[in-house]
């Protein structure tokens, strides 16, 4: 099946032959659907703290930071913005010249509201000899759209989302990258320093670094802190091999194997290399202007406070187990694991070994928002490989759509996860966990793609906040919808929250 040439290609990527064979086997066997117990809800896996409790959690977080702990804000930022502009690419290629769809009309009717308006106007002047208003008056709408998308214009069709102008301010417009630097200063700084880590695609790395270098000093002065900003790329060793519909390796025209990025689950490797006590994770496009940041900052501190409060208790209990727990202590620890960490033993023997195993693992607290029809992974009580039940974030692809009961759970779930996580990644002795050990490898999924018109099967690794964190202790906290403002299309920037 694999030639000498294949083995060389695999070795260059840092992948073993066993991994490739295991991936090709996964195409044949597929991945099992998850066994669900219930959708999580308030009082069943989701905490909804009142004002007094929120204050306690914020205080707990600030006290924790004051101990000189190392906090890092981790931002997956490798996504290209191309999908944001799908409708505008379609307009440029359409066989009509004036805005026709509702989307196109909205874009051009509100064009002055975009934070990139001035930059686009300047590039139109340069390339077309006319500004946006004059081009529109001439009916030359396509020139405006093309100058936004194409390389000789703003190149927004190719740039990473993190470098597009999102929000207007008196002193100019800001990109999501800049908004994340500001957030880092506001809730993730300790010892007068904010550590921010961006994962960036190889092709955009130099540009991203240059833009960060250009802006970081401004915010460091503004907030009176120092920044330590680091970058990484998805590792080539996390790419997965593609297969033909008959599960044989898909090959490029030159006979080489085709590899594809393994999805955001690959970032567990990047996360594993971060030296931190606590790591905040939030997507690059989920940012708001300064006027709306206080709510985000408050809730970030609340979920971090929940995390360090639970972690402190777990560490205390692990030390008791080390010293030899009495029956009364074992009962107390068992109650903590079942009530606070929402882990149900399901008939397994709840002894010291079981409790240690459930406590001595990475921990995450995830913000969840009420379902308002935004697509996203949901919080569920799910069966683990060992037969116990605990909390997970599930995507629809992990659920058997033929199981009516499960589909009902999924569609009637009250909350979803907007990728808003705070993670504790060291054990009670202060040593870092090896995060890849806590991945549930059976939670990848297979999708259908094509290359040069040929159908292929692609293998996605267990998602970063799904199967890659399957064996972590997980707790959910309800956060307000105002803390979640993703930008999936360019017109989302016209929503009030981004103005």
Predicted regions span which residues?
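Polybasic, low-complexity association/targeting segments
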Residues: 1-35
């Amino acid at each position: 099946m694999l030639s000498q040439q294949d083995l060389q290609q695999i070795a260059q990527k840092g992948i073993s032959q066993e991994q490739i064979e295991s991936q090709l086997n996964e195409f044949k066997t597929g991945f099992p659907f998850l066994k669900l117990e219930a959708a999580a809800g308030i009082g069943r896996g989701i905490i909804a703290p009142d004002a007094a409790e929120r204050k306690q959690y914020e205080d707990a977080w600030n006290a924790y930071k004051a101990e000189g702990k190392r906090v890092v804000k981790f931002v997956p930022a490798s996504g290209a913005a191309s999908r944001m502009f799908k409708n505008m690419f379609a307009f440029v290629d359409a066989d009509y010249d004036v805005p026709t769809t509702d989307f196109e009309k909205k874009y051009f009717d509100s064009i002055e509201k975009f934070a990139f308006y001035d930059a686009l106007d300047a590039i139109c002047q340069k390339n077309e000899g006319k500004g946006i208003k004059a081009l529109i008056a001439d009916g030359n709408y396509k020139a405006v759209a093309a100058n936004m998308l194409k390389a000789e214009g703003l190149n927004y069709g190719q740039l990473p989302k993190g470098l597009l102008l999102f929000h207007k301010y008196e002193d100019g417009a800001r990109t999501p990258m800049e908004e994340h630097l500001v957030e880092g200063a506001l809730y993730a700084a300790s010892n007068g320093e904010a550590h921010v880590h961006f994962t960036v695609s190889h092709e955009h790395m130099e540009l991203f670094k240059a833009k960060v270098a250009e802006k970081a000093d401004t915010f460091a002065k503004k907030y009176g802190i120092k920044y330590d900003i680091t970058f990484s790329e998805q590792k080539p060793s996390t790419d997965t091999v593609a297969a033909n519909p008959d599960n044989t390796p898909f090959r490029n025209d030159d006979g080489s194997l085709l590899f594809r990025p393994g999805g955001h689950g690959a970032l567990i490797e990047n996360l594993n290399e971060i030296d931190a006590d606590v790591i905040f994770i939030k997507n690059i496009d989920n940012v708001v202007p300064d006027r709306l940041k206080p709510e985000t900052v408050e809730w970030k501190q609340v979920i971090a406070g929940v995390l360090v409060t639970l972690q402190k208790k777990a560490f205390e209990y692990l030390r008791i187990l080390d010293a030899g727990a009495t029956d009364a202590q074992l009962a107390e620890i068992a109650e903590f694991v079942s009530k606070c960490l929402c882990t149900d033993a399901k008939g397994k023997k709840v002894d010291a070994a079981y409790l240690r195993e459930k406590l001595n693992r990475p921990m995450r607290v995830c913000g969840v928002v009420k379902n308002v029809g935004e697509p996203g992974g949901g919080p569920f009580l799910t069966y683990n490989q060992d037969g116990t039940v605990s909390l997970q974030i599930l995507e629809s692809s992990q659920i058997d759509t033929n199981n009516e009961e499960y589909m009902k759970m999924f569609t009637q779930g009250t909350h979803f996860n907007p990728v808003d996580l705070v993670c504790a990644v060291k054990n009670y002795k202060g040593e870092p966990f090896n995060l890849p050990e806590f991945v549930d490898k059976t939670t990848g999924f297979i999708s259908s793609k094509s290359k040069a018109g040929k159908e292929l099967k692609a293998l996605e690794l267990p998602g970063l906040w799904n199967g890659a964190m399957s064996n972590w202790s997980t707790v959910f906290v309800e956060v307000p919808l105002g803390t979640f403002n993703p930008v999936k299309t360019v017109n989302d920037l016209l929503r009030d929250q981004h103005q």
